[in-house]
Each structure stands twice: as C-alpha cells, then as structure tokens.
Amino acid sequence: MNKLPDGWTEYKLKDIMSISSKRYNPNKDTKNYKCIELEHIESETGILNGHTNSKDIHSVKNVFEKGEVLYGKLRPYLKKFYLAKFDGVCSSEIWVLKGKKVINDFLYYFIQQDNFNYIANVSIGMIMPRADWSYMSEISFNIPPLDEQKRIASALSKIDAYLENTIKLIEEKERFKRGIAKKLLTCKEGENIPEARFKGFEDEWETKTLENICKNIKTGKLNANAMEKDGLYRFYTCAKDYYKINTYAFDGEAILISGNGAHVGYVHYYNGKFNAYQRTYVLMDFTENILFIKYYLDIHLKYKINIENNKGNIPYIVLNTIKDMEIKFPSLEEQEKIGGYLSLLDAEIDNLKKQKELIKEMKRGAMQKLLSGEVRLVDNYD
C-alpha cells in the first residue's frame, strides 16, 4: 500500500464493498426486467449498448437495483463496469457491488482504478479466467472520508459526461455517413441513376467489374500471428483494426478486404508501405477513383457475400467473388466528388475518435491522482 493520505483510512476490500447474493429465477419469478449480459457493456467506458428481457432467458441471473455497481468478473481484463440507472437482472458472470465504507458513486470509479484491476486479474481458471473474490476480499486499500468521496465522484462524473457526449457524437456522425453514403452510392431499382447526387451531374452510371478496373488483385503471404509489437509498418489481417510489423510487401495506394473470419468483407483503404495476412485481399492500380470504389464496396460487398452464403457457399471470399464484383460508375469527376465528400466525413469521425481516446487518457490520469490522494479536492470544489 502507498502512504496513507491525511484523513484517509485503510480497509480490506471486504469492508469496503459487498457482493449481492440476490438471484432471479425465470422459472419462479414472473416480473419482466431488463437483463444485462457482458456483451451489452462497452469495455473501459461504462456505456450500456443494449439489453435483453428477463422473460426471454432460461438461466438464473443476479438481481441489481438502481445505483448499484456492476463489474464483469469473467475476463476482468476487458474492464466491463456499469453504474445501474434502473432496477434489473444481469449475467451471473457480473458482480453486483454495493458500497459499505464508500458511496456507490465513488465505488464505481474505485473499481476502475489500476490497483483494483490488477488484483481482479489475479484470476482463477485458464480458459475462462474469473476474478477471485476470496483472494481480492483480503487486499487493503486506502479510502477517503465521505465528503471527499463525493467530490471525487463528482469530478470524475464530469469527465464521463464529456466522454459519453463525444461517443454519442461519433455515433451520430457514423449514422449520418452511412445514410448519405447509401443514397449517393445506390442506384434506383432498375435504373442507372443514384438515389441522391450532387448538383451538376445527370449522366447514367456504367456497370463494370472489379477485374475490369483493377490491374492488381492478390492476397498477402503472412500468417495472422506475424504481427510485431512496435513494428514500423501496418499489418492488415481480417480484423477491423490493423497491427504492426517490421517488414513490408506492398507500397502504394490500396484497398484491403478481409477474406474470412467474423469481419469477412470489411474494407480498408491505405496509402503507404504495409503488409498483409494470406487471407486478406490487396487491390492496387485502379483505372477509376479508389476512394469511390472503397466506399461503394463498404455499402455493397457484404450484400454480395450474403447472397453467396445463402446459396450454401462457405463464409469466406474467393478470388472470383472479388473479380466479378459489379460496380456502377459515374463520370470520374462525380466519383471524385463522392469519394472526397465521404472521406471528409471519415476525417471528422477519426478526429472525434482521437478526442475520445484523449478524454479516456485524461480520465485515467485524474483517477490515478484522485484515488491515491496525490491530488486533493477542496471543500468548495463543486
């Protein structure tokens, strides 16, 4: 333990908080509640992204009340936590926590700190690691007095509100971009004219295949685990995010398409030196505007993949799926207009995502200082 700050008290975790033992049995309880599973809680942010209903479940769940704190004990490294805004039930893999020596608003931030996460990850079970309360409950922490708990919780909740507003803005921008992209890139039924277009463009669009307009279609050569920490170049697998590696096999402007896995058909655009997994398709040397093609594939490639899967084909992309993909093209000038506009929207979204990460970093720094007593908030902080 660190030096005890003035006015703070050292307690074992079992004296700081308790785990609720209330259970919901769908075979006996008839009232319907919102049910939170681990997948409904966003990692690291405490944001709830949905729920199911207790009437639709068949297993015993934990009961929680508004104001109690939920903490995912399964794979605690995922950092899933939520301050309940309603009464409900949740997965048995989620602890329902209530403060004993602390108020719940403070407890919500207490469980997010690095020291708590460290002991939570001294877990039991190899394949399905779970936090071990019998071990954790005996670990001691320094706790501030009640009035300081309130000030700390208030300060951190303001950062959370800023973070949540930024996330909502990202979601709104992404919804807008998806909607306008679909209208700009989808032709009316039986016609070669899009649902929406910029002023000054009236010509019909022309259908071409990717093979017609892309001179270089190949895959990467590497295994998916070839990534290297702190590598110099991007390494694209079939995931949504890229990794790093110290060697490159491609240099230039390219579209990359995930060829299998959970994100089959996901489309990346990159300009520079990079490497790729052996099931990632790399498309280079286009005769049409590459950004227009990228955004067109974002909208329409998944639809083609789904049709082929419904015919019984295995859920991965073969080369002919790429080559035979039909794209409707306007004039090069209109392609550039559409691609440029959508890339500007993407740039706005990327800037907001960077802002989101900066806010998360600011929150981590504030938690470190406030929850250790390194920084103390004065009585009239609010």
Where are these regions (language model features)?
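Short alpha-helix capping/helix-loop boundary micro-motifs
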Residues: 50-59, 242, 283
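Residue-level recognition of short, solvent-exposed, well-ordered loop/turn junctions
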Residues: 9, 52-53, 59, 64-66
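Short, ligand-facing micro-motifs at secondary-structure edges
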Residues: 33-52, 69-93, 104-109, 117-123, ...
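Non-catalytic DNA-recognition/assembly elements of restriction-modification systems
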Residues: 1-24, 196-220, 226-237
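Amphipathic alpha-helical coiled-coil/heptad-repeat segments
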Residues: 1-11, 143-204, 326-382
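A short glycine-rich beta-alpha junction/loop motif
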Residues: 6, 74, 89-95, 124-147, ...
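Short, solvent-exposed loop/turn positions at domain surfaces
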Residues: 57-58, 157, 164, 311
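Generic structural signal for buried aliphatic residues
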Residues: 64, 69-70, 156, 342
